[in-house]
Amino acid sequence: MKFERGLEKLNIEFLKDKPLKDFTTFKIGGKARYIVFPKNIDELIEIIKLVKESGINWRIVGNCSNVLVSDKGFDGAIITTTKMDFFKTEENLIEAECGCMISQVARKACENGLKGLEFAVGIPGTVGGAVYMNAGAYDSEIKDVFECAEVLDEDLNIFKLGKSDMRFSYRHSRLKEEKLILLKATFRLQYAREEDVPPIEKANEYNQRRREKQPLQYPSAGSIFKRPPGNFAGKLIEDAGLKGYRVGNACISGKHAGFIVNLGDALAEDVRKLIYHTQKSVYEKFGVLLEPEIEFIGEFETPLFEMSTK
């Protein structure tokens, strides 16, 4: 096939017909026709040119820590950025490629006495994913430290966006609105003062809290739902009596109801059914429609709940 030959000619690493469950933190998902691993921005651009010329479906992902992949897999190319992982620190600025693990960038910042990214040390996603969804925890968000980014548009033009250009809001950025691909981001941090809790201590404290409150022993995609205004998804789910509720081997965690965990070989459709049931139950009990925070890849039989389907 033209796409495959193009990758081989450019010496770009790829896998063929491999299950995506091996690449997601949920450990769920069928096969992708291709999984492609660009090592730098030039390779990423060449891959996108090839998928456009070949007319095949494509999707860019990072660490797949916030996604549910269909049991049917993905009939096209999954482009994963995890090998685009260079970052550098200049005084209180950190510039990181999209595939860097945000946890590693954050830990390095903390070790260097820089504060602002302590909340991200336990987040399992990439810089690209963190900026895309304005990731956050413990009353902090990526937008708080975001300085600027280089992005790629549909016509393969590279340009810079500043903080005000990104239209950040809760778990949202301009990257979700437009077909823009983040290539690298720069974060502006602050030097910790003598009277401050050392950043690495604060980061370690946050991680300890995560271990105590989150079901980290099971595969998951993190928080399944966005926080509804004035409330918490996990509390509403727990108050609806759904802790421990399961469909197949997908289960609402008994430790933290905001998580759905994979107890072993769970199917994506099990998770979708569980999401639907959770949305429906919470809406009928409290009148609140929970909106998924995770991304969906591929085709699903089970719909998401809508108020009109009540």
UniProtKB/Swiss-Prot annotation:
<dbReference type="GO" id="GO:0009252">
    <property type="term" value="P:peptidoglycan biosynthetic process"/>
</dbReference>
<feature type="active site">
    <location>
        <position position="293"/>
    </location>
</feature>
<dbReference type="GO" id="GO:0051301">
    <property type="term" value="P:cell division"/>
</dbReference>
<comment type="similarity">
    <text>Belongs to the MurB family.</text>
</comment>
<keyword id="KW-0961">Cell wall biogenesis/degradation</keyword>
<dbReference type="GO" id="GO:0071555">
    <property type="term" value="P:cell wall organization"/>
</dbReference>
<dbReference type="GO" id="GO:0071949">
    <property type="term" value="F:FAD binding"/>
</dbReference>
<dbReference type="InterPro" id="IPR016167">
    <property type="entry name" value="FAD-bd_PCMH_sub1"/>
</dbReference>
<keyword id="KW-0285">Flavoprotein</keyword>
<dbReference type="InterPro" id="IPR036635">
    <property type="entry name" value="MurB_C_sf"/>
</dbReference>
<dbReference type="GO" id="GO:0008762">
    <property type="term" value="F:UDP-N-acetylmuramate dehydrogenase activity"/>
</dbReference>
<dbReference type="InterPro" id="IPR006094">
    <property type="entry name" value="Oxid_FAD_bind_N"/>
</dbReference>
<keyword id="KW-0573">Peptidoglycan synthesis</keyword>
<dbReference type="InterPro" id="IPR016169">
    <property type="entry name" value="FAD-bd_PCMH_sub2"/>
</dbReference>
<dbReference type="InterPro" id="IPR036318">
    <property type="entry name" value="FAD-bd_PCMH-like_sf"/>
</dbReference>
<dbReference type="InterPro" id="IPR011601">
    <property type="entry name" value="MurB_C"/>
</dbReference>
<feature type="active site" description="Proton donor">
    <location>
        <position position="223"/>
    </location>
</feature>
<keyword id="KW-0274">FAD</keyword>
<keyword id="KW-0131">Cell cycle</keyword>
<keyword id="KW-0521">NADP</keyword>
<dbReference type="InterPro" id="IPR003170">
    <property type="entry name" value="MurB"/>
</dbReference>
<dbReference type="InterPro" id="IPR016166">
    <property type="entry name" value="FAD-bd_PCMH"/>
</dbReference>
<protein>
    <recommendedName>
        <fullName>UDP-N-acetylenolpyruvoylglucosamine reductase</fullName>
        <ecNumber>1.3.1.98</ecNumber>
    </recommendedName>
</protein>
<comment type="function">
    <text>Cell wall formation.</text>
</comment>
<dbReference type="Pfam" id="PF02873">
    <property type="entry name" value="MurB_C"/>
</dbReference>
<keyword id="KW-0963">Cytoplasm</keyword>
<keyword id="KW-0132">Cell division</keyword>
<keyword id="KW-0560">Oxidoreductase</keyword>
<keyword id="KW-0133">Cell shape</keyword>
<comment type="pathway">
    <text>Cell wall biogenesis; peptidoglycan biosynthesis.</text>
</comment>
<feature type="active site">
    <location>
        <position position="171"/>
    </location>
</feature>
<dbReference type="GO" id="GO:0008360">
    <property type="term" value="P:regulation of cell shape"/>
</dbReference>
<dbReference type="Pfam" id="PF01565">
    <property type="entry name" value="FAD_binding_4"/>
</dbReference>
<feature type="domain" description="FAD-binding PCMH-type">
    <location>
        <begin position="27"/>
        <end position="192"/>
    </location>
</feature>
<dbReference type="GO" id="GO:0005829">
    <property type="term" value="C:cytosol"/>
</dbReference>
